[in-house]
């Protein structure tokens, strides 16, 4: 049931795992949720109707890419990102900070914000906490992120602490800039690298700001999975139980299962779409590389039990041919399959938490991956 206000309700718990709903005027997001990434206003190789039919309640838009092209002001003139891109449900936008730190050229960072040159044409821009919130407002997203500084791991402790403290000050400025917007939310972002005391400090400070939701950033950036999970075990018990928790940029199906077990409610990642464009399929049997010659004369589908036409109705031989030939349809079908599998996984997770058997579901799912793909013909 939609609401004129932003709200989150936990409907069931199984250990630290939570099943619930985020309510917004544009729709309800069932959690745990996976958000397909629509970097430049499109989920690559997919129609928006397909994305919705697969079970996605919310998608992600990228502030950095959209501010550069076509421009936030232009999107606003065209009715906002929902109207512009044809997605009627909720949209979450990131702040642009991660891309500024990783993609932009000649960046200069100080207390005020960050100046940088576009990776597209070299044009100079300035991003401040206030400007980030302004851009996200022009895009008219439903959930907005604070501007933060994300350090690459490994990072010296002194540098990690400096970035974390700066991100906290920027969170305060973003909160002021966001103000009171009924039906929308701004999330703070917990930083602190792989250092527990810094993560604790960040989580406690953001909790004191009484924001509508909380993200965990700066993970899944090359560190071992155990480090990511250790940081979640530090952060999640600190964050308010009545607010949603979003792990940014994560991840693999295994990452998702283990993060849900530690109390995370929301995820996004380019992995299913990017992998689909490179010939890799996610299935109940684990990852399947359609480039491999073993599929060249295999008449079987990826998964005969799947509800997704891409997974069920096309032979592996045909998918192999499309991938090897560089045909656009190959990327489209494998992206469709991958997003279908991710939403199938999330649906199973939600049902398992509601039924109190999340541990059994996790064991059965991981056993399926471990058994591997069906034998070659």
UniProtKB/Swiss-Prot annotation:
It catalyses: 7-aminomethyl-7-carbaguanine + guanosine(34) in tRNA = 7-aminomethyl-7-carbaguanosine(34) in tRNA + guanine. Pathway: tRNA modification; tRNA-queuosine biosynthesis. The active site is at residues 94, 268. Homodimer. Within each dimer, one monomer is responsible for RNA recognition and catalysis, while the other monomer binds to the replacement base PreQ1. HAMAP family: Q_tRNA_Tgt. Belongs to the queuine tRNA-ribosyltransferase family. This is Queuine tRNA-ribosyltransferase. It comes from Brucella suis biovar 1 (strain 1330).
